[in-house]
């Protein structure tokens, strides 16, 4: 098993909102934070904070970094790999 994938899966798993955001982006391709907040039921401040953390770990990609409003986010291939790992492990454990 890839150690980096395990570390990132742990990073996502310890904060359930991160997994909600990744799932939302995976299901919707490109979204702005307010759309993510609406779709997940999370507060916009929480979404913005978690997106920053997910971006630092290269799990999401900011398409228009020069914009202050209307920032477009997309899940990365690494983010999809982490989600697939978590979803597989969750199914095995249930």
Predicted regions and their residues:
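Conserved segment of winged-helix/HTH DNA-binding domains
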Residues: 27, 72-94
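Short alpha-helical segments that sit at the start of domains
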Residues: 1-20
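A short acidic, leucine-rich amphipathic alpha-helix
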Residues: 35-39
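Key DNA-contact positions within bacterial/archaeal DNA-binding proteins
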Residues: 45
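Beta-hairpin "wing" of winged helix-turn-helix
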Residues: 57-67, 74
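Pre-recognition alpha-helix immediately N-terminal to the DNA-recognition helix
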Residues: 19-23, 81
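Residues within the helices of the helix-turn-helix
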Residues: 23, 33-34, 52
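Short capping segments at the starts of secondary-structure elements
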Residues: 16, 28-32
